[in-house]
């Protein structure tokens, strides 16, 4: 668990994005209202970070769709949580924050800005070399896919690997690392969630429906354990090499010895032994390759998304967290107050016997409002729906 503070730091950073100015200036009702909250808690530092690209910061990409054989402009609304470990360098870098290290992991003091993971997501959409299986001349392409869903999922995997390659140039000798759970809504229709590590995303739907949009990556899970062992690693006490309680993460290059990245053929050497193996990044002991799940949004049923780090999921299971949020929605509580209560309740569960409740905590709630539906309209709809589901009216 590492060193802890004797008393928790319960000051919270709450960002409630109602986009009132946007609606007033454009007359267009915003989409995907959201609220993010974080709290340092008992940890010595805050190592969580997040990313929100919505409304004025929506990402637009020029994407070649081989299934219709033409270019399209796609809108990407992106929400992400990064849970750092070994410091906040990696998580802050992924979020597009400023970094302070040179290629050897030393402080350079200049705080150079960077675009973070979103840069590589956009790059991978605009520069992919994939086609459909119906293409009669597929030899010119890296790979062909049966479905657009499969192709887009591969694009997210490419983006994660490219980002990890960039991280190596800054943090090769650092012990920092980070999870990532990224929810990307494409053209306001299709939800893709790419996950690497044990942060998590879930989707709430009407009639108490809960859809898991990511799966935790733990070393003791059989598929992860096989990959770790095949690459010469071991798992003890639920940790890779007895150290890392994750089996997938950004950075953590001590567990990626000899990995060769495909973009610039950058080979990572074992820093202590200077051995090279040419291991694909997907086969490293701790791989950065995410799982990617897709969901077609049904605005008549789907209600909201929750993305959170494991500091939250140590306290709540999926059902408990959705129930907590809906309990407060039915009483008319706004999102910023719900997030505040969520964090306060979480820190109150700190238990030295179980070890839960001592981690940093970060959560994002994303409203899935239909086109033209204001935030107040959504609140009213949710309150009415929940009252009916609970037999209160």
Curated annotation (Swiss-Prot):
PROSITE patterns: PPM_1, PPM_2. It catalyses: O-phospho-L-seryl-[protein] + H2O = L-seryl-[protein] + phosphate; O-phospho-L-threonyl-[protein] + H2O = L-threonyl-[protein] + phosphate. GO terms for cellular component: cytoplasm. One of its GO terms (biological process) is signal transduction. Pfam families: PP2C. Its cofactor is Mg(2+); Mn(2+). Binds 2 magnesium or manganese ions per subunit. Keywords: Hydrolase, Magnesium, Manganese, Metal-binding, Protein phosphatase. Its EC number is 3.1.3.16. GO terms for molecular function: metal ion binding; protein serine/threonine phosphatase activity. Mn(2+) 1 binds at residues 83-84. Residues 33-368 form the PPM-type phosphatase domain. Gene3D superfamilies: PPM-type phosphatase domain. Mn(2+) 2 binds at residues 83, 310, 359. Belongs to the PP2C family. Present with 149 molecules/cell in log phase SD medium. This is Protein phosphatase 2C homolog 4. The gene is PTC4.
């Amino acid at each position: 668990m590492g060193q802890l503070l004797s008393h928790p730091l319960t000051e919270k950073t709450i960002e409630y994005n109602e986009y009132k100015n946007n609606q007033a200036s454009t007359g267009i009702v915003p989409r995907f209202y959201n609220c993010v909250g974080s709290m340092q808690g008992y940890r010595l530092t805050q190592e969580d970070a997040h990313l929100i690209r919505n409304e004025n910061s929506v990402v637009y990409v020029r994407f070649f769709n081989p299934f219709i054989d033409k270019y399209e402009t796609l809108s990407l609304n992106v929400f992400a949580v990064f849970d750092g470990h070994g410091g906040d360098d990696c998580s802050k870098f992924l979020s597009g924050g400023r970094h302070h290290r040179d290629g050897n992991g030393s402080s350079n003091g200049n705080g150079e800005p960077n675009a973070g993971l979103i840069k590589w997501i956009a790059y991978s959409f605009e520069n992919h070399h994939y086609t459909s299986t119906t293409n009669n001349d597929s030899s010119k392409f890296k790979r062909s896919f049966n479905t657009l869903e499969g192709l887009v999922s591969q694009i997210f995997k490419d983006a994660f690997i490219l980002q990890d390659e960039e991280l190596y140039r800054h943090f090769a000798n650092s012990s920092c690392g980070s999870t990532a759970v990224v929810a990307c809504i494409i053209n306001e229709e299709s939800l893709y969630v790419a996950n690497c590590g044990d942060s998590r995303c879930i989707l709430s739907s009407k009639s108490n429906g809960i859809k898991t949009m990511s799966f935790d990556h733990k070393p003791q899970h059989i598929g992860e354990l096989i990959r770790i062992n095949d690459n010469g690693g071991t798992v003890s006490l639920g940790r890779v090499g007895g150290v890392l309680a994750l089996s997938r993460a950004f950075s953590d290059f001590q567990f990626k010895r000899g990995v060769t990245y495909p973009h610039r053929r950058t080979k990572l050497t074992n820093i202590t032994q200077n051995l090279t193996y040419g291991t694909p990044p997907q086969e490293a002991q701790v791989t950065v390759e995410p799982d990617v799940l897709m969901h077609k949004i049904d605005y008549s049923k789907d209600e909201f998304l929750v993305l959170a780090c494991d500091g939250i999921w140590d306290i709540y299971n999926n059902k408990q967290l959705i129930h907590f949020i809906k309990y407060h929605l039915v009483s008319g509580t706004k999102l910023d107050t719900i997030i505040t209560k969520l964090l306060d309740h979480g820190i109150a569960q700190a238990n030295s016997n179980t070890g839960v409740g001592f981690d940093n905590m970060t959560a994002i709630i994303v409203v899935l409002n239909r086109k033209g539906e204001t935030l107040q309209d959504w609140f009213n709809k949710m309150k009415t729906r929940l009252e009916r589901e609970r037999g209160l009216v």
